[in-house]
Amino acid sequence: MAAADALLGSLVTGLYDVQAFKFGNFVLKSGLSSPVYIDLRGIISRPSILNQVAEMLFQTAENAEINFDTVCGVPYTALPLATIVCSTHEIPMLIRRKEKKDYGTKRLIEGAVNPGDTCLIIEDVVSSGSSVWETAEVLQKEGLKVTDAVVLVDREQGGRDNLQARGIRLHSVCTLSTVLCILEQQKKINAETVERVKRFIQENAFVAANPNDSLPSVKKEPKELSFGARAELPGTHPVAAKLLRLMQKKETNLCLSADVSESRELLQLADALGSRICLLKIHVDILNDFTLDVMKELTTLAKRHEFLIFEDRKFADIGNTVKKQYEGGVFKIASWADLVNAHAVPGSGVVKGLEEVGLPLHRACLLVAEMSSAGTLATGSYTEAAVQMAEEHSEFVIGFISGSRVSMKPEFLHLTPGVQLEAGGDNLGQQYHSPQEVIGKRGSDIIIVGRGIIASANQLEAAKMYRKAAWEAYLSRLAV
């Protein structure tokens, strides 16, 4: 037992060291503010810990003397854990899809399904037990028996009892209380943190009234989250999180649209105004004297002043073509642009082509959901389709170019062009709205300003004014 305790202690501290256990203030999916967040997705990049977790899950099942024929991991974090267990111990594995595909086999369960077999469910973390139960229901519809589930961490918020009431025994490698005890003993966290987390657990249990009810989730109307809080949401893309954090740090939600034709002017704008902005948007194909050396200088300035570079390319072709446009040609956009954007018109292939290039480089994309020009066709069902496409490709798409908030998911960013301090328009159909209108009333996150700053006699003062107006509109929105 002492050896097992030492092994568990080593695993828990190892997981803490790779930030799988985070303590602070985190907004959960339900809208609750939690003092602890468990995120095991990162262990896929740490084979030693991944293997250790998988083996401890298997040993937990062995110690409980569970009889089973197959294993199914709850998508998605538990999938690699289930794969290692099955591969190491030569056990047949099943994969549950989150949604049925409209092509191929169209099955929700992949693998050799033998009705009457008993399937063991593997999960990383259990709160209410809903994720385990959803997987069990799908397996049972295929004629499989589900009697047990093993989990790395039981958050002790009612999941064990809820599953027991539905005929599923939950076996955990450890509970959250055990994690707290180990980390306090190792001086990773203090007693105050331990008490805060324990109080949260006690006050936020998920308990169903009877076994026939669907498993509960805490319902709470989420309030407007700060940029900083949104950066820490588990579903926020790393590029979006980076942008949100620097917005919070610099207190700016201003994107400068530097639509200039000379590289020298572009670099001067970036250097002079970089400290006031969160994003620099450019059209690289209108630079008369483009070179990759200019882009190197621009990325150096971006690091110095802490802003991201957004190439306003508006890709709108088939996947294979946009892939070549993104990574190759004269501009080699993927090598220097943190963000690009694309139209939804070509269908999901445009995103798939871009993400083949961008994902390995830690880049991201915005979809054009609405436009600020008069007579735009990007409205209604087109906008809805763009939102759906973003949700289906959230591993690469981090938000939208839009005139207003088109998605209620706080993980997505909304950037709005056509902003001036006073509403109006130009003779080419551009329509302008004020920062207060765009941020305060329409729910956008970032204003995109070009001529309002660049055409000003004092560009720095103009940038300060736009930054102040947009940030104050954001703060007012938080206060509502």
UniProtKB/Swiss-Prot annotation:
SUPFAM superfamilies in alphabetical order: PRTase-like (SSF53271), Ribulose-phoshate binding barrel (SSF51366)
Span list, region OPRTase: 2-214
Record's keyword terms, sorted: Acetylation, Decarboxylase, Glycosyltransferase, Lyase, Multifunctional enzyme, Phosphoprotein, Pyrimidine biosynthesis, Transferase
Subunit note: Homodimer; dimerization is required for enzymatic activity.
Family as reported in the entry's similarity comment: In the N-terminal section; belongs to the purine/pyrimidine phosphoribosyltransferase family.
Role summary: Bifunctional enzyme catalyzing the last two steps of de novo pyrimidine biosynthesis, orotate phosphoribosyltransferase (OPRT), which converts orotate to orotidine-5'-monophosphate (OMP), and orotidine-5'-monophosphate decarboxylase (ODC), the terminal enzymatic reaction that decarboxylates OMP to uridine monophosphate (UMP).
Name by which UniProt lists this protein: Uridine 5'-monophosphate synthase
Organism: Bos taurus (Bovine)
